[in-house]
């Protein structure tokens, strides 16, 4: 399998599928073509395809492919049909009520970050075979240069994040597809003039030295006798835009629900092939069972515009905003702890006045947005924290200042005549700013806040609070449905490989959209995000329905997004595939 994995990786890298470019479509086309060449998908062409991302101006797609043991979901029903000779109508009804098929989801993304950091070596950054020859001591860290000389690592843009893991998952899906097809061919026999599926064992784990990671006792306890002969369903999902705003994963929730219903699937576990680091011992790999949440609070301050000479009669919005920043930036009291994991405190990413040029007057408005990473805090709790800090700052201000959330401002605007026409034009311009002028979500959020204040002719001092996209819900697999079953998967993974399973992946990930606990769909974020709707959204209710527990678990990689990006050859081609094979059969 080593050759197949490296061949897939080589071809994926050659697509140079930089995020937010049409090159992402080149990768999608190549991946779908790879699957369609497999005999299994020639037999079942309806089990792979491209799912267009709704409303995406670049017309990108999610690539999906499903391998499913026919008859696995109808085992009891098939036996009953043969024994009792039930009618076709009864047979169809039984199929509709069949037990769903245990399903593992291989998930990842096919977009990569740009290669600018490679400097003179950039033209070869996407060439798996030649990039190493164009890297040297000057362009690499000492550790990376040592790895380069060792020959034990593969270099190049995307090999680590995350085309390497994607290549492994594609190769394993192809392997499983071949075995299932062979099983189907052998198990179709004619009895009493009817074709009946006769279940036969399928050995989906190849014996070999890479299988020795679990001793016999562990294997029998965790996987059970004959577990390697079981066969459920394996769904591959690769999305675009993970490196930007996760439009691919957000847009694919309806795909997941649709496939679940169409093919009678039971999503037991998702494995995101995000590259993992190792501890200092070089052996223990860090795996995550959750993903940190991310919010982007936006604060717009409107002061009272006067010439500097009349300072005491005015109000400088920069003074208020700077105090809000000082009260929240790096505030350790806001951080969260989960075991020995600690979240990062609030970090302001943008703070400035909104004057377009220089003059001898105070700025009318100033604004900023702040990066907030959460473990369990909700948008409502984050909003309450910032509003509390804002009101505390305003207690020291002599001028009266109105504090309002975005939803309050918007509801005031809705009461005014001409609002409908105003909002239609606003939404048209909003799309133009995002899609044609390539403004960012925070920039357009601030533009919407200012435009709405102007529509109301609101000229009194005020602070408006809201959120800008993106929003990544904090998630823990242990809070999903079937927590006891997931505990078994954790135990199995720990037996298969030397790992340290942590909870919150510290960088945001698409796994935030695998599910949220039932009853946590609070609308506070939606109603206080000016861009929520046409330009940014995801199906919150679908997350509560799906609830797919997951591991962020990929091959061992280093220096992703840097010129020294690399993936360990042994981890990629031997260790990771072997562990995934066995983990599949723990789930099935």
Task: Mark where each language-model region is.
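Extended hydrophobic secondary-structure segments that form protein cores and membrane-embedded regions
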Residues: 105-107, 233-240, 270-272, 463-467, ...
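Acidic/histidine-rich catalytic neighborhood of metal-dependent amide-processing enzymes
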Residues: 153-188, 193-290
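Short helix-terminating capping/connector loops at secondary-structure junctions
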Residues: 42-45, 97-100, 220-232, 262-266, ...
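Short, conserved micro-motifs enriched in small and acidic residues
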Residues: 22, 154-167, 315-318, 570-574
């Amino acid at each position: 399998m080593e050759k197949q994995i490296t061949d897939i990786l080589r071809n994926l890298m050659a697509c140079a599928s930089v995020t937010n470019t049409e090159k992402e479509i080149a990768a999608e086309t190549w991946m779908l073509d790879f699957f369609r060449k497999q005999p299994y998908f020639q037999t079942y062409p309806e089990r792979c395809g491209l799912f267009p991302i709704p409303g995406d101006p670049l017309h990108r797609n999610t690539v999906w492919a499903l391998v499913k043991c026919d008859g696995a979901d109808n085992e009891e029903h098939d036996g009953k049909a043969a024994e009792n000779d039930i009618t076709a109508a009864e047979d169809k009804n039984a199929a509709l009520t069949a037990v769903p098929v245990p399903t593992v989801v291989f998930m990842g993304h096919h977009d990569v970050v740009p290669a600018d950091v490679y400097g003179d070596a950039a033209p070869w950054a996407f060439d798996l075979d030649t990039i190493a020859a164009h890297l040297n001591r000057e362009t690499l860290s000492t550790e990376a240069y040592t790895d380069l000389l060792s020959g034990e690592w593969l270099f190049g843009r995307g090999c680590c994040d995350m085309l390497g893991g994607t290549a492994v998952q594609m190769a394993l899906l192809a392997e499983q597809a071949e075995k299932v097809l062979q099983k189907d061919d052998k198990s179709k026999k004619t009895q009493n003039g009817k074709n009946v599926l006769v279940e036969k064992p399928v050995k989906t784990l190849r014996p070999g030295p890479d299988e020795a990671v679990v001793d016999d006792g562990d294997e029998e306890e965790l996987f059970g006798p004959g577990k390697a002969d079981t066969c459920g369903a394996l769904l591959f999902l690769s999305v675009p835009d993970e490196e930007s705003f996760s439009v691919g994963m957000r847009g694919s929730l309806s795909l997941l629900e649709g496939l679940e219903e169409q093919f009678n699937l039971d999503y037991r576990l998702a494995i995101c092939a995000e590259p993992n680091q190792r501890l200092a011992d070089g052996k223990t790999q860090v795996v995550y069972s959750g993903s940190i949440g991310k919010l982007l609070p936006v604060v717009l301050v409107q002061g009272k515009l006067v010439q500097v000479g009349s300072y005491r009669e005015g109000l400088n919005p920069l003074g208020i905003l700077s105090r809000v920043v000082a009260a929240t930036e790096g505030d350790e009291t806001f951080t969260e702890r989960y075991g020995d994991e600690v979240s990062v405190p609030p970090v302001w990413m943008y703070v400035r006045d909104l004057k377009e040029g220089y003059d001898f007057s105070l700025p009318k408005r100033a604004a900023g947005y702040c990066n907030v990473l959460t473990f369990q805090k909700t948008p409502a709790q984050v909003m309450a924290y910032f509003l509390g800090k804002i009101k505390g700052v305003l207690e020291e201000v002599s001028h009266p200042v109105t504090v309002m959330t975005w939803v309050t401002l918007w509801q005031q605007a809705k009461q005014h005549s001409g609002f409908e026409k105003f909002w239609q034009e606003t939404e048209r311009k909003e799309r133009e700013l995002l899609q044609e002028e390539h403004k960012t979500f925070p920039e357009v959020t601030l533009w919407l806040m200012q435009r709405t204040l102007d529509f109301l002719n609101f000229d009194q001092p005020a602070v408006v609070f809201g959120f800008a996209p993106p929003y990544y819900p904090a998630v823990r697999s242990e809070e999903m449905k079937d927590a006891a079953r997931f505990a078994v998967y954790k135990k199995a993974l720990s037996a298969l490989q030397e790992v340290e399973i942590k909870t919150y992946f510290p960088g945001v990930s698409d796994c935030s959209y695998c599910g949220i606990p039932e009853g946590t769909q609070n609308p506070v974020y939606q109603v206080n995000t000016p861009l929520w709707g046409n330009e940014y959204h995801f199906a919150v209710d679908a997350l509560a329905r799906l609830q797919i527990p997951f591991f962020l678990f990929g091959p061992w990689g280093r220096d992703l997004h840097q010129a020294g990006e690399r993936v360990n050859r042994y981890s990629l081609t031997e260790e990771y595939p072997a562990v995934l094979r066995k983990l599949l059969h723990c789930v099935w």
